[in-house]
Amino acid sequence: MHVMIAWGKLRLGAWDQYEHFYKERVAVTTKGIKGLRERQLLRSTEDPDEGITVSMWNSLEDLLNYERSELRQTLAKEAEHLYRGEFWVKHFEVRDHGR
């Protein structure tokens, strides 16, 4: 399993708008994409304008196919006005499920 983590700082006070975008656009349009196992939105308890999205994928190939897709590019472009310039995306391989 592979994980894509996107971290970012939003414009001050933009969290509610971002959360609405995430639930109405990201979660809805990516549901059923090949290889996507789960998706989560996390909000910092220390900074209300900081968040992380975590998506879990069956394979690195599935993750990369999504990341390079037109859909992913469109969603990123639609959300970019909510960020204040601090943003990164990283990929990880799950080495231990802890189960």
Short names for language-model regions:
Residues 1-51, 56-70, 83-99:
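Short S/T/G/P-rich N-terminal loop/turn motif that feeds into the first structured element of a domain
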